[in-house]
Amino acid sequence: MNFDILTLFPEMFDGPFNNSIIGKARDRGLIDINLIDIRDYTTDKHNTADDYPYGGGAGMVMKVEPIYRALTDVRSKRKGEYPVVLLSPQGKTLDQNLVKSLSKHDGLILICGHYEGVDERVRQIFSPLEISIGDYVVTGGEIGAIVLVDAVSRMIPGVLGDERSKVEDSFYNGILDYPHYTRPRVYQNLKVPDVLLSGNHGLIEKWRKKQALKRTLIRRPDLLKNKKLTPEEEELLEEAKAEIEGEYND
């Protein structure tokens, strides 16, 4: 899968995209990340890619012309489905369902908003899919692009060393992940649950499902409102509710 990222600050991506899972995926040719410096598409000697807003106000606005040239150039080199995504606080909040949907395309063209945002004509010309990573303020769309690329890349076959990791991640199946443990068995009088040491894979799987439902019920009950549960999951959820009530009463 290809990611074309239009940005004023390509150096912001060096660390996140050259290490860990993303770095390995790039080395193996599973994903390709193309960083496009918007300033390379300016025409004046100062490489001006932003300007003061009409009507006054604080901050600067990213100019439409260099973004148009950069995006048009990228599109001319790509074949297939390449939706244009604008990282913006005004966009749809990124969640796992959206991540899965985005991963089905041949690639994505990402525009990283910065300063006070992009000239409105970028939206009018390209009608991008606007995506936000949450209701809070960060330095620029570059941070959102890093999150999006990481999340989408995990959906691509072969990127994860063990495909089970993808399925067991929080949110992949609409609920939170179950608790994880490793050695030692006991630390500061805190013990690993006996079931995980039993070797009984059926019991372990059942325990993990119930713990995932229990954790979701405690921390993110909203996720369960529209979640379609299997009969087994419904039974485990009732058991989890009883356990929570018992812990509360104790």
From Swiss-Prot:
In short, the EC number is 2.1.1.228
Q: Which InterPro entries match?
A: Alpha/beta_knot_MTases, tRNA_m1G_MeTrfase_C_sf, tRNA_m1G_MeTrfase_TrmD, tRNA_m1G_MTases_N, tRNA_MeTrfase_TRMD/TRM10
Query: Residues of the signal sequence?
Result: none
One cellular component GO annotation, for this chain's record?
Answer: cytosol
Task: From the Swiss-Prot or TrEMBL record, state where the protein is found.
Answer: Cytoplasm
Q: What is its main location?
A: cytoplasm
Q: Name one GO biological process term.
A: tRNA N1-guanine methylation
Keyword entries, A-Z? Cytoplasm, Methyltransferase, S-adenosyl-L-methionine, Transferase, tRNA processing
Which reaction is this enzyme known to catalyze?
guanosine(37) in tRNA + S-adenosyl-L-methionine = N(1)-methylguanosine(37) in tRNA + S-adenosyl-L-homocysteine + H(+)
Q: Name one GO molecular function term.
A: tRNA (guanine(37)-N1)-methyltransferase activity
Instruction: Give the source's domain of life in one word.
Output: Bacteria
Q: Which residues bind S-adenosyl-L-methionine?
A: G113, I133, G134, D135, Y136, V137, V138
Concerning NCBIfam families, the annotation shows:
PRK00026.1, trmD
Family note: Belongs to the RNA methyltransferase TrmD family.
What is this protein's function per UniProt?
Answer: Specifically methylates guanosine-37 in various tRNAs.
Complexes and interactors: Homodimer.
What is this protein's name?
tRNA (guanine-N(1)-)-methyltransferase
